Amino acid sequence: MLNEFPIFDYEDIQLIPNKCVIKSRAEADTSVTLGNHTFKLPVVPANMQTILDENVAEQLAKGGYFYIMHRFDEAGRIPFIKRMHDQGLIASISVGVKDYEYDFVSQLKADAPEYITIDIAHGHADSVISMIQHIKKELPDTFVIAGNVGTPEAVRELENAGADATKVGIGPGKVCITKVKTGFGTGGWQLAAXRWCAKAARKPIIADGGIRTHGDIAKSIRFGASMIMIGSLFAGHIESPGKTIEVDGEQFKEYYGSASQYQKGAYKNVEGKRILLPAKGHLQDTLTEMEQDLQSAISYAGGRQVADLKHVDYVIVKNSIWNGDASH
């Protein structure tokens, strides 16, 4: 059993304020660098079909935000890279580990994307290690993100294989049911898992899943994440690709997991479910609100930039943050 170290999740933690050193939260710098590029926020929308399509990816890149295009339109990936590069934008795509993906990666030499994410549910695998090595051999200048993992051993192995960043999180997301279907994962202790993995990491960690509030972004950074991948908070916007559905006169958008039957089109090895989210406004409004909330967090930390969040004290409050208000 691994409970020798503290096990906690986002709602169990409160960060402790420090003396504020800026006149206004607007002075706080929320930017973060990953590889050779700097982005406005340390967040990335989940590379899922109901979160982004090519239009959303383009909007994010133009706005100075990091994005990772999903891997479920395989034939469209090379034209997508070209279209992004033609506009002077970064190309960031996902690959799997099936045999044909090796040929695909080799075809990218002529127009290599800046970022490739190797994206499988259980990323601590020989198949992922060999794909990392293949990408690094074929496209040495491409930044490789590999995942998903949930242990320090996995982080070290993927880094040693050549990964430039690792993605941590096994099934903590709102539409992921891996924890229920298999009994495995970081659901319920995702924040502690990120901390455990970050202590072993020499390269950036991307915390993936379980984010329910903007404050969770600051908490992720406190416990070692360089970037935070977010699904449900980015789903359901006007620009989101999910179908809009009307129920009793109210607008909802569908949001489903990457291993759900809705995405797979077949009921086989299903580890994702579909939910309806109340339709939100524009994606940019959420990004702006996230930026302002993170600026406030930096000011509470007594800092001026994102990295200052890494040094604040915290308490473990065991689920009492909402004071019994379960509606959150």
From Swiss-Prot:
One Pfam family, short name: IMPDH
Residues where NADP(+) binds: 205-228
SMART domains given in the database record: IMPDH (SM01240)
Domain of life: Bacteria
Catalytic EC class: oxidoreductase
GO MF annotation list: GMP reductase activity
Active-site residues (renumbered): C176 (thioimidate intermediate)
An individual GO BP term: purine nucleotide metabolic process
GO cellular component, one term: cytosol
InterPro entries to which the protein is assigned, alphabetical: Aldolase_TIM, GMP_reductase, GuaC_type_2, IMP_DH/GMP_Rdtase_CS, IMP_DH_GMPRt
SUPFAM superfamilies for this protein: Inosine monophosphate dehydrogenase (IMPDH)
Catalytic activity as recorded in UniProt: IMP + NH4(+) + NADP(+) = GMP + NADPH + 2 H(+)
Gene3D superfamilies referenced in this protein's UniProt entry, alphabetically: Aldolase class I
PROSITE patterns the record matches: IMP_DH_GMP_RED (PS00487)
Function: Catalyzes the irreversible NADPH-dependent deamination of GMP to IMP. It functions in the conversion of nucleobase, nucleoside and nucleotide derivatives of G to A nucleotides, and in maintaining the intracellular balance of A and G nucleotides.
HAMAP family, alphabetized: GMP_reduct_type2 (MF_01511)
Protein's name in the database: GMP reductase
Species name: Streptococcus pneumoniae serotype 19F (strain G54)
